[in-house]
Amino acid sequence: RGFDAAVNEGIRESRTPYVFLLNNDTKVRPGCISAMEARMEREKELFSDSARMVDMRNPEIMDGAGDLYSALGWAYAIGKGKPAAYYGKPRKLFSACAGAAIYRKSALELTGDFDESHFAYLEDVDIGYRARILGFSNAYEPSAVVLHAGSATSGSCYNEFKVFYSARNNVYLIYKNMPPLQILLNAPLLLAGFAVKTLFFLKKGYGGTYVKGFCE
């Protein structure tokens, strides 16, 4: 049924003001959830708060400080592969990474569930996008530390499953959330972004998979 269906089922069963989502290839350091909950209590406009995800093999290296969405139509983890020391300050961001993030239950009732059409990948960017449209914001909390192995479920950094769904969901994300005028104005950059990604995955041996996902 996919990541989104499982997450939605858990959220519906929850009876707390906040819900904490966590990947199955992580370890949570002490104080993580309490730090995120305190931030949500202080800043009532927050839809979500993303943890400081660091590499499980080398915690001095970042795995991600939430998600950024660029004009090229690319969504990616902020700070991935960079020194964790550079990401010690709280900040606002485009969306939280659902691999380790806390969400406001009352706001989820307004945005709706995680979109199960995604199945996997970019569902966190999609729901963060929807929350921003409704006037909420998303944040990064550096004192909430989570160690992340990375791609433990899908098997590797790049594989057919991940490349296909990432490409498909990238197009769906734009179609679903961007107004037609914004799509028109951003079209040159979006097309350039897709062209660069196609070339990148051709070199990785997944060009056909990426194009298939893009056209799905």
Task: List where the protein language model places each region.
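Short aromatic/hydrophobic "clamp" motif used to bind/position activated sugar donors
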Residues: 19
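Acidic metal-phosphate-binding loop of nucleotide-sugar-dependent transferases
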Residues: 1, 25-27, 118
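Conserved donor NDP-sugar-binding/catalytic core segment of glycosyltransferases
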Residues: 26-70, 74
